Amino acid sequence: MTLFSLRAGACVLALMAGTAGMAAAQVTIVRGNDTDPATLDHHLTSTVAESRIMNDLYEGLVVQDAQAKVVPGVAESWEISEDGLTYTFKLRDDAKWSNGDPVVAEDFVFALRRIMTPATAAVYANILYPIANAEAIATGAKQPEELGVEAVDEHTLKFTLNAPTPYFLELLTHQSSLPMHRATVKAEGSNFTKPGVMVTNGAYKLVSFVPNDRIVMEKNEHFHDAANVAIDRVEWVPFEDRSACLRRFEAGEVQMCTDVPAEQMAYMRENLKDELHIAPYLGTYYLPVKGADGSPLKDKRVRQAISMVLDRDFIAEEVWQETMLPGYSMVPPGISNYVETPPALDYADEDLLDREDKAKALLEEAGVAEGSLTVQLSYNSSENHRNTMTAIADMLKNIGINATLNEMEGTNYFNYLKEGGAYDIVRAGWIGDYSDPQNFLFLFEGGVPFNYPRWENAEYDALMDKAAVTQDLGQRAQIMADAETILLDEVPAIPLLTYSSRALVSGKVQGYEDNLPDVHLTRWLSLAE
């Protein structure tokens, strides 16, 4: 049995508390975000921009510290059974909601049952399928009360899993596993997220939300670690225009930008080198391909041709100014729990001119004459994405494919894709919720809202189902590698780049540490004078 207690992490937390405790005169931080959240109902969220907001408002059983290590949150300790199928959490008795109510085990049970209920329509429900009966509940085959999570008593919560899940603790840091204030949700329904109504249990509570302007939060005085939260007020400002965040950062109006304009990288490296943070990031930038019924894009040879002709080195080095790496797989390099030599597109090392010749041959084989195919390249508003799609349009000309650009508003962009919106080729990105290949490969399973191309492949789904219940981790890794091999052959989505995180962080901000998932909760930060 594996046992973790709060005392085991006390040294790490004490060091953080010491940093956070360096309170300065300035207690308000203004943080740039990629876009506004489409919702503050964490069961309906799906983007990184939304997760940043949720991480400040709520606290899960476990949380990620400044280095993104899993540390105690509402749970002060936990035990894992020898077979890896049972996780038992002991909740701290001083955890409280922002209205002073105690946080109890039933708050987690209520939330987890709600997210699995089909009527909730939670796009992230399937991320919790490792929990016993979760998938059956999400598909309507079983009742929410049958979910493998139990409030043993007010301060003890037990999970039962289908199979050993090496990333389960990391998964519990995700917004899909956060608790809910039952009384407020029951009384207010969908209005529970409104300022003045919303009750949260994290380091901060919601004060106001003005779309396209800012979200304002203030310290939750009932938070169990409030004494070590150094920043009293957080203002999250949306910046779909990354250059606007840069300008306001230089003016001293914003202390942190979560992304930066790649075309101004040389300027920032010269003038803001101490504030510019570029670090490895667990994410893939990719191009889902769909097309209308009868479109040549439905032919995998056409998709393969498009993928072959893309000069990923140029896009990474010139468009993104060496802040990205060329990507030839959906699962990013360096991920945990995978095979030693992961699958990759087999033309990664071929000369680009040779690839263009092969691409033209594939198009001819598919019956696509030169100049006969026009595709629309859609992307969410950002100069970085616009420049990427402009470069791709030029590359497609080399094999006789015409392309037009379609810029879409960012806040509802991914909702449009999740709801099955029509498109030819779009840009998308996926940042790992946990370090496991499953978190990238599940995106293309049948029935998953994140399967933007609505691609269906029975063999692929069967392999992913098999991996989910395979207890031998080596066998599990190979099964998922077999699934990715199918994915890379069919290319319903074209891997393009491997992410790096790019941020501007004021020298006044203390406690910020680069980490692979690029998670930076405000509670770990402080501001120097």
Regions found by a protein language model. Name each.
Residues 149-150, 316, 352, 402-414, ...:
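Extracytoplasmic/peripheral linker and loop segments enriched in polar/acidic and small residues
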Residues 326-365, 382-387:
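Structural transition elements
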Residues 503-529:
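Long beta-strand-rich cores associated with HINT superfamily self-processing modules
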